[in-house]
Amino acid sequence: MTHTAHPDSVLIVDFGSQVTQLIARRVREAGVYCEIVPFQSAEEGFKRLQPKAVILSGSPASTVDEGSPRAPQIIFDSGLPVFGICYGQQTMCMQLGGKVESGHHREFGRAFLDVDKDCQLFEGLWSSGSRHQVWMSHGDRVTALPDGFEVVATSSNAPFAFIADEKRKYYGVQFHPEVVHTPDGAKLIGNFIHNIAGIKGDWSMSAYRQKAVDEIRKQVGDKRVICALSGGVDSSVAALLIHEAVGDQLTCILVDHGLMRKDEAANVVAMFREHYNLHLLHVDASDRFIGELEGVSDPETKRKIIGRLFIETFEEEAKKLGGADFLGQGTLYPDVIESVSFTGGPSVTIKSHHNVGGLPERMKMQLVEPLRELFKDEVRALGRELGLPDSFIGRHPFPGPGLAIRCPGGISREKLEILREADAIYLDEIRKAGLYDAIWQAFAVLLPVQTVGVMGDGRTYEFVCALRAVTSVDGMTADFYHYDMEFLGRAATRIINEVRGINRVVYDVTSKPPGTIEWE
């Protein structure tokens, strides 16, 4: 996390809800900077950030259980506006003198809220006597309010569904305004931030860009930085931001493991050298990687081999440069908070980027992570701010291990070339059909299965290619994309006709869950 105060910010205290990140997304969408802190370190985070408002998240815990999480008292002593969501409402009530009981009437899913009284938080949105859809997910419920609170809305199973202490600017809801199933939820959060807390909402990528550049210059000084450039959006945006800050003090290294999409490495190198004047080393290590991967079928073993070889190769190239004091990395905010569990204690380990895990310690370098406060969509917006073309920023996610995990079973050069060609044709057809931006991720998979076919007058015995396409918001859940059959037939025909080694194409109609987006 950052180590500085943020004027006009919101602190989100995380009690372990699976949707706490969505609260942060809604706050950011309202143009306001926010940070998530686990409840164990919330007092420290409050003092550091110096926010103008606090939001208390939901939790899988029960407020009636001994030792269940609590908000630090400093929040209620501060005089700042507080918005408690689900568990956040319950712990606020208990800590301020109200009562909560383990629910006999559990409430999950869609519910309807009846507004009984007007409230400052409803301004321009709801009025007394109206009814609105919300999303509930709770077992416990408030049974007695603290002094100063009143009920402003109810549901059939939650008589204290929306409570308010307008004088102290404390608000609590039993439902989840952060999820899309509460249609007016984002506006409620926006009203709390703008109308109740008085925060302007002028946090922008332009402002973030200047702040990040200033911080990088202050951190790096006149020292050297090296950055692992994968060709993905995250590492590319990080590299451009660092380059804007320190110029020629940055050297980027692209380790080409031979597992990238067709022409990808060459295109990335050309773009950054020609258009952004970056000092970029292109290291062709494909023989080294594929040589060790050939015949390896276990997906976890593949990942470990790729990770180890990447570190070894990167380390060797960095030493040739004479070393550096700093390592640039495209860590995002979800990476920072992903490993923070409300049961995990105050000391947490931040997840390392898959490509450079272990490098800072091995090479005695400090990390420069200019994106660690941003979500993925914000990184894309920053990329546009930095001048990256939409065609690059809008590319589908691509895994660090590359085609190795889209080739189940043993890997060989021949299989990788077959897969690379099939994948290129599939993506070409998607673009021609105008579907690329409607799909979260699409790719081909080469199965370790051969089937009998007939081509011309001859019998064939060749591989099966599976096509995958999903829609998603954040990659946490996904549904398969519903193509029309004409498109699938056209793509399959091209692949079979143009790619030697494939004689059958199938389409994967598995959602996540129960499946994962990638096959390995």
Curated annotation (Swiss-Prot):
SUPFAM superfamilies: Adenine nucleotide alpha hydrolases-like, Class I glutamine amidotransferase-like, GMP synthetase C-terminal dimerisation domain. The active site is at residues 86, 176, 178. GO terms for cellular component: cytosol. Keywords: ATP-binding, Glutamine amidotransferase, GMP biosynthesis, Ligase, Nucleotide-binding, Purine biosynthesis. The keyword Ligase applies. Disulfide bonds: none annotated. Its EC number is 6.3.5.2. Catalyzes the synthesis of GMP from XMP. This is GMP synthase [glutamine-hydrolyzing]. The gene is guaA.
